[in-house]
Design a protein with these regions (language model features):
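Bacterial Sec-dependent N-terminal signal peptides
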Residues: 1-25, 40, 97-104, 523, ...
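Structural motif
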Residues: 21-35
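Short, acidic, small-residue-rich periplasmic hinge/interaction motif at the N-terminus
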Residues: 27, 72-73, 88, 92-135
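Short Pro-Gly-centered beta-turn/loop motif in secreted/extracellular proteins
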Residues: 32-36, 58-65
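A short, solvent-exposed loop/turn motif at the edges and junctions
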Residues: 42-44, 69-80
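Short, acidic Ser/Thr/Gly-rich low-complexity loop/linker segments typical of extracellular
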Residues: 45-56
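Structured extracytoplasmic
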Residues: 109-282, 288-296, 359-461, 465-468, ...
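Exposed, low-structure sequence patches enriched in small/polar residues
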Residues: 253-255, 378, 388-878
C-alpha cells in the first residue's frame, strides 16, 4: 500500500502536457531581415511575448483566443486569426511612417536613440508627474489591501483527466481541477492563502504601520507543521510591485521601474498607438530591456493622453530569455484609477506565473496573486494606530476570522476549487495508507518525524544526525527530540543523547525554553521573547561554533583533513532573548563552561612546559610522547556573562524545525557583543573581556549581479590561555559554509585582535551568457575573496622569552613527532600580512548545484597549509 501511495504522489506531480505552441519568425517585408523585440500578444488578454534577437518567437495557444496581434513601432500592426491547428506562423511586417498627435515615429531599422526620442520624452514627463500621484504627500492616509495567493499544479491535459489512473481511482482529484481564465489551461489548485491588511500613514511625525487583520490559509501546505514556509516564500518572491518607485524587489532581485531615471537607461521605449482603456484615452508605450539577457521586464504602459501623464494601466511580462530560473511565463497587470476624493492610485494588481523544474518529471506549477486596494481615507488618524512597535503588526485573532469578516473584506470571490480546498485536503488524508506517505515525506522535507498526527506534541530529529562519526567518537549514534506548542505553547523542551563507540562515553544535551509569547508550533517564531536554560556535555571541535548547521550533520561531518584536536565541553547556560518587530534583537546570557582537551589536544602552561623540560633533562621522565604529561593542565573552567545586540531592518526568514533560514538576503545585518568573565566567580579560572562586532550588506550592480560583504572584528582585552584567544571561523567540511574560511585549519591562527573581510560577487551569468553553450545551461559565475588580519599582543604570545615561565599562557596546539620533537599546528600571524584566499565558482548547475574552487594565496610555507580545495553546496535560487 505504501508503494502504491508513493506512486500516487509521483503520478500527481508528473501530470503534464505539452501545451500547443505557436512559433515562427517575424521579418521585414522589404529586406527579409528579422525584427527583434516585436510585440506579439492576445489583445485585451494580458498575455504576450516579444521576438528575440533573431526575430524568433513562441507563444502558447489558448482555446477561444482567435486573434494574435503583431505590432512594432514603424510597422503596420497585423491581427492574424489562429486556431488549435496553428503551429508555425511566420509573419512579414510592412514598414510605415506613423504619426501620433504630430509626433513622428521613425522606422524600426534606424538605430535606437534616446536623444530626441518622443517615447523617452513622454516617459520623462511621466516621471516628472510622479510626485503629484504620491499619496505620501498627504498628511494622513489609510486603506485596506486584500491579497490572495493561489498555488496550483499546472497544465492538466484532457488526456490526463481521461486516462490517468490517479483521476480514475480518486474522483476528488478530478473535482478539484478547474480552468484558469487567463491561460485557458486546466489547473489543480493545491493551496490558497488570503490576507487582509490595513495600512496607515502619518507624515509628521513620520510613521507607517501595516496591520494584518485577517489570514485564511488552506491547502496541502497545512499537512506540514512548517507549511507556512510556502506562504512566506511565495510572498517574499512575488512581492507587490510599485512602478512609481524607482526600484522594486521581485523574484528576490531588484528591478528598475520603467518610469524611473534608471529605467530610461535600462529600457528601450516605443510609442505604439492610442487606445481607450475603459473611458480614458491613452498612449500605449512598449518597452524592452536593452539586453534581452538582463533582468528586466517587457511590457506596455498606458499613459493618459492629457496633461497629467498618469499611468492608467501597466502590463509587465518576463521574457523567456531572461536569465531567471524556473519561470516559464509571467504576466503582471496593474490598473490605476481616480478615487472619489481626486487622488490617483493603484487599485488592482494581478500576477500570474507559470513555473517548472525538471519539467518532464515534475511538470509545471502556477502561482497566481490577486491584490485589491480599497476603502481609502485621508482624514486625520488617531495616535493609537501608530503606537505599536514594528512596521507590521499581526492581530491576535487574525487567523480566527469568521465568515462575516471575509464577506466584508474579500474583494474577489473564491473559485469553486478554492472553496473546496478544505474538503480536498480532507479527502487526501482519508486515502488508505496516506499517513505512511506523509511520514516519509515529512522525514525527507522537515528532517524530523512527528510522533502523532495531526497535532504532534513531540518531534523526533534531526534525522541526519542519528548516525555519524568523528575522531573521538568513532561511530556515533544519537537520538534527539523536541516538544512543540501542541504540548505547551509557552514551554518547550529539547535534547539529545549520543554515544561514541570509540571513547565509550555518553554525550547529552537538555534544554528548557520558556516563551513569554504564545507560539503556534516552534519557540523561534518571530518575534522571539524567551528565557532558556541549557545543559550540555559533548565533544566539540573549537571550530564547531562557527558552522550554521548541527555539528552532527552527516554531510558536514566529513572533513577535508584529519581533525584530531577536540575538547570535552560541559556547559550550563541561562539565556534571555528579546526580538523587536523593527529588526532589533537583544541577547544576554550567563554561562558556566568546563573544557577538557581530548584526542591530540592538550593544555600545558608555559610554566608546566619548563617543568617538563627540566624533568626530561634530569632524567626523571623518558619517552617521546608527552600529550598526557603529568605537567599538563587537566581542564579549564570559565564563567562568563555576555550581552549582544543585533539589528537587521527588513529581514525576513522561514522557520524550519531546526533553525531559521533567511529569505530576504537584501536586509543589512549589524551586531555587537561583549563578554565578561571574572576569576573566582562561579569557579572561573580567568578574568577576561571580549568584544566582537560584525556587519553584512548586499550591493546590487544592476545586470552585473550582486556583491555580498561581510565585515567582522574582535578584541580579547586580557591575558588568557590559547583556548580563550580568537580563532578564525574555519570550515573543515566540503560543504560551502558562509562567513567561514575554507582553507584555514582548526585553530591555525590564534590572535587577540582581528578583522576579517569576506567579499563575494555573483555575476548572475553576465559573462557566461556570452558563450552560447553556457548561456543555454544558465550557469552563473562567482568569484570571491576572504581576508583575515590578525595580531597577537606580547602579553598573549607564548613564544616570547618574557612569557617562558608564565602560569597563564599555554603552549599552542601541535603534535609530537616520532623523534620527540613538537610540530606546531597553530601559529602567530604577521600583523602586516593578512591571510588571503580566493574563490572562483560555477553556480546554478542544473539550477541546483554550486561548485567552487578555493585557493590560498599566502602563508603556504606553513607545514599544515592546505593550498587549494573544492567545495560545493545544494541551493535553489531564482
Amino acid at each position: 500500500m505504501v508503494k502504491r501511495l508513493l506512486l500516487i504522489f509521483i503520478g500527481w506531480f508528473c501530470m503534464m502536457e505539452i501545451a500547443a505552441q505557436i512559433h515562427g519568425v517575424v521579418v521585414d517585408a522589404n529586406t527579409g531581415e528579422p525584427i527583434p523585440y516585436l510585440n506579439i500578444y492576445y489583445d485585451g488578454k494580458g498575455v504576450g511575448t516579444v521576438t528575440n534577437n533573431d526575430g524568433e518567437y513562441s507563444i502558447a495557444y489558448h482555446a477561444g483566443w482567435t486573434k494574435l496581434t503583431f505590432s512594432m513601432v514603424g510597422y503596420e500592426t497585423q491581427e492574424i486569426i489562429v486556431s488549435a491547428k496553428t503551429s508555425e506562423l511566420n509573419v512579414r511586417m510592412k514598414e510605415i511612417d506613423q504619426m501620433l498627435d504630430e509626433i513622428i515615429i521613425r522606422p524600426k531599422k534606424e538605430k535606437y536613440s534616446r536623444k530626441n526620442n518622443p517615447a523617452v520624452e513622454m516617459i520623462k514627463k511621466v516621471i516628472a508627474s510622479k510626485r503629484r500621484t504620491d499619496l505620501k504627500q498627504k498628511d494622513f492616509y489609510q486603506y485596506y489591501k486584500y491579497q490572495k495567493i493561489m498555488f496550483a499544479k499546472n497544465n492538466i491535459t484532457a488526456d490526463t483527466l481521461r486516462e490517468s489512473w490517479l483521476f480514475k481511482q480518486y474522483p476528488f482529484f478530478r473535482d478539484q481541477v478547474e480552468v484558469c481564465d487567463v491561460t485557458g489551461k486546466n489547473i489543480l489548485p493545491l493551496s490558497v492563502d488570503e490576507t487582509v491588511y490595513e495600512n496607515v500613514y502619518r507624515k509628521e511625525p513620520h510613521s507607517e504601520k501595516t496591520y494584518v487583520r485577517g489570514i485564511n490559509s488552506t491547502g496541502v501546505n497545512e499537512l506540514f507543521s512548517t507549511g507556512e514556509m510556502l506562504t512566506t516564500v511565495l510572498k517574499d518572491v512575488f512581492q507587490d510591485i510599485d512602478i512609481y518607485q524607482d526600484r522594486f524587489r521581485f523574484l528576490q532581485y531588484p528591478f528598475d521601474s520603467p518610469i524611473s531615471e534608471a529605467g530610461i537607461r535600462f529600457y528601450k521605449f516605443y510609442i505604439m498607438d492610442t487606445i481607450y482603456v475603459e473611458r480614458d484615452k491613452c498612449f500605449r508605450l512598449s518597452f524592452v530591456p536593452n539586453n534581452s539577457q538582463d533582468f528586466g521586464f517587457t511590457g506596455s504602459l498606458y499613459i493618459l493622453a492629457d496633461s497629467t501623464y498618469r499611468v492608467k494601466q501597466c502590463q509587465l511580462n518576463l521574457p523567456k530569455k531572461t536569465d531567471i530560473n524556473f519561470v516559464d511565463h509571467m504576466v503582471i497587470d496593474q490598473k490605476f484609477g481616480e478615487l472619489p476624493t481626486g487622488e490617483w492610485t493603484l487599485l488592482e494588481d494581478d500576477m500570474l506565473c507559470e513555473m517548472s523544474y525538471l519539467k518532464k518529471v515534475l511538470g509545471s506549477f502556477l502561482v497566481r496573486r490577486t491584490t485589491r486596494y480599497f476603502d481609502f481615507n485621508f482624514d486625520p488618524l488617531p495616535n493609537r494606530l501608530f503606537k505599536q512597535k514594528g512596521k507590521e503588526i499581526k492581530d491576535v485573532n487574525a487567523m480566527m476570522r469568521d465568515n462575516e469578516f471575509w464577506s466584508k473584506y474579500r474583494q474577489e470571490d473564491l473559485t469553486q476549487s478554492e472553496q473546496r480546498m478544505g474538503s480536498f485536503v480532507d479527502d487526501l488524508t482519508k486515502i488508505k495508507g496516506f499517513k505512511y506517505v506523509m511520514f516519509f515525506l515529512k522525514a525527507l522535507i522537515e528532517n524530523f518525524v512527528e510522533t502523532s498526527t495531526p497535532d504532534s506534541k513531540v518531534d523526533i530529529g534531526p534525522i541526519n544526525t542519528m548516525i555519524t562519526s568523528n575522531y573521538i567518537d568513532g561511530l556515533r549514534l544519537r537520538a534527539s527530540a523536541q516538544t512543540t506548542a501542541n504540548l505547551n505553547p509557552h514551554l518547550f523542551l529539547k535534547g539529545y543523547y549520543a554515544y561514541g563507540f570509540k571513547d565509550k562515553r555518553s554525550k547529552y544535551m537538555g534544554e528548557v525554553e520558556y516563551s513569554f509569547d504564545k507560539k503556534e508550533y516552534l519557540p523561534r517564531e518571530f518575534p522571539k521573547h524567551s528565557m532558556t536554560f541549557t545543559y550540555q556535555y559533548d565533544n566539540m571541535l573549537p571550530s564547531d561554533k562557527f558552522i550554521h548547521t548541527d555539528k552532527d550533520n552527516v554531510f558536514t561531518s566529513l572533513k577535508v583533513c584529519t581533525v584530531d584536536q577536540y575538547n570535552y565541553e560541559r556547559k550550563a547556560t541561562i539565556k534571555y532573548e528579546r526580538e523587536r518587530e523593527f529588526g532589533f534583537k537583544t541577547t544576554a546570557f550567563v554561562r558556566y563552561a568546563n573544557y577538557e582537551p581530548c584526542g591530540k589536544l592538550f593544555y600545558r602552561t608555559m610554566a608546566g612546559e619548563s617543568q617538563l623540560q627540566s624533568a626530561i633533562a634530569n632524567g626523571r621522565l623518558s619517552g617521546t610522547e608527552w600529550v598526557h604529561s603529568p605537567f599538563n593542565t587537566h581542564d579549564i573552567t570559565v564563567a562568563e556573562a555576555s550581552i549582544a545586540f543585533r539589528y537587521a531592518p527588513g529581514e525576513t526568514f522561514v522557520n524550519t524545525k531546526q533553525r531559521r533560514l533567511p529569505v530576504n538576503l537584501d536586509a543589512p545585518v549589524f551586531s555587537i557583543q561583549h563578554t565578561l568573565s571574572v576569576k573566582g566567580i562561579l569557579g572561573s579560572d580567568y578574568t577576561y573581556n571580549m568584544t566582537d562586532f560584525s556587519a553584512y550588506k548586499r550591493f546590487w550592480l544592476n545586470s552585473w549581479g550582486n556583491i555580498d560583504v561581510y565585515l567582522k572584528g574582535g578584541i580579547q582585552w586580557n591575558k588568557v590561555p590559547f583556548p580563550l584567544l580568537i580563532m578564525p571561523a574555519a570550515n573543515l567540511s566540503y560543504i560551502i559554509q558562509e562567513e567561514t574560511f575554507n582553507l584555514i585549519n582548526n585553530m591555525e591562527f590564534l590572535n587577540d585582535r582581528y578583522a576579517s573581510l569576506d567579499v563575494s560577487w555573483n555575476m548572475q551569468g553576465k559573462l557566461f551568457n556570452r558563450i552560447p553553450l553556457l548561456k543555454k545551461l544558465k550557469w552563473r559565475e562567482f568569484i570571491g575573496v576572504k581576508c583575515l588580519w590578525g595580531k597577537l599582543t606580547d602579553k598573549n604570545n607564548p613564544f616570547l622569552e618574557q612569557n617562558r615561565n608564565d602560569n597563564v599562557l599555554m603552549m599552542f596546539p601541535g603534535h609530537y613527532n616520532a623523534a620527540g620533537g613538537y610540530d606546531y599546528s597553530s601559529y602567530v600571524m604577521d600583523p602586516h600580512k593578512p591571510y588571503v584566499e580566493i574563490t572562483a565558482g560555477i553556480h546554478n548547475i542544473f539550477k541546483l548545484l554550486h561548485i567552487e574552487y578555493v585557493r590560498r594565496l599566502n602563508y603556504n610555507n606553513l607545514p599544515t597549509a592546505n593550498k587549494w580545495g573544492i567545495r560545493f553546496m545544494i541551493r535553489t535560487v531564482f
